[in-house]
C-alpha cells in the first residue's frame, strides 16, 4: 500500500519526466562529437581498406603474375581473372575485374598476393550512378594504381615491419 502511494506521488509530480529533462539538459551544452562529413574529415588509418588498385614495377611492367590466388581466396567471388602465356613463358593477366558491388573489402586478396600487385588504397570516396560503374576492369585498376602509387608505396613501407 505504501509503495502504491509513493508511485502515485512520483507520477503526480512527474519525477521521471524531470529526470529525463535533466539528462537532456546535461548533454545539451556538452561538446559535440558529430562530424559534418563532406566538409570535415576524420583521420584515416594507414591500414584502411578502400578502393582497389593494381600496381606496376618501376620499369612500367605490371606486377600481377596471374597466379589467381586473390581470385581463389576472395570470399565474395568478386574477382575474375583470365591469363595468357607470353612468348618468354611467363603468365600475365589479360582480364582482371573486380566487382565492387560484391566486394566486402576484407583484404584477403591483398594478403594473398605474393608480389603486392593488388592493393587496397586509402580512397573512400567513390560512387556510381549505375551498377556497372562499380565494376572495375584491369585498365581502370592500373590507372588507380598509377595515380596513387606514391601513397601506396609509402603505406607499404610504413607497414613493412608488421607484415
UniProtKB/Swiss-Prot annotation:
Reactions catalysed according to its record: a quinone + NADH + 5 H(+)(in) = a quinol + NAD(+) + 4 H(+)(out)
Assigned EC number: 7.1.1.-
4Fe-4S ferredoxin-type domain boundaries: 54-84, 94-123
One GO term describing the cellular component: plasma membrane
Membrane topology, record value: Peripheral membrane protein
Cofactors demanded by this protein: [4Fe-4S] cluster
Top-level EC class as recorded in UniProt: translocase
Keyword field: 4Fe-4S, Cell inner membrane, Cell membrane, Iron, Iron-sulfur, Membrane, Metal-binding, NAD, Quinone, Repeat, Translocase, Ubiquinone
Locations listed in the record: Cell inner membrane
Main location as per UniProt: membrane
Co-factor note (free text): Binds 2 [4Fe-4S] clusters per subunit.
Residues at which [4Fe-4S] cluster 2 binds: 74, 103, 106, 109
GO molecular function list: 4 iron, 4 sulfur cluster binding; iron ion binding; NADH:ubiquinone reductase (non-electrogenic) activity; quinone binding
Record bears the keyword Cell membrane: yes
Domain of life per record: Bacteria
Amino acids binding [4Fe-4S] cluster 1: 64, 67, 70, 113
Pfam families noted in UniProt: Fer4_7
Family (UniProt): Belongs to the complex I 23 kDa subunit family.
NCBIfam families per the UniProt record, alphabetical: NuoI (TIGR01971), PRK05888.1-4 (NF004538), PRK05888.1-5 (NF004539)
Subunit: NDH-1 is composed of 14 different subunits. Subunits NuoA, H, J, K, L, M, N constitute the membrane sector of the complex.
Name of protein: NADH-quinone oxidoreductase subunit I
Annotated organism of origin: Cupriavidus pinatubonensis (strain JMP 134 / LMG 1197)
Taxonomic lineage: Bacteria, Pseudomonadati, Pseudomonadota, Betaproteobacteria, Burkholderiales
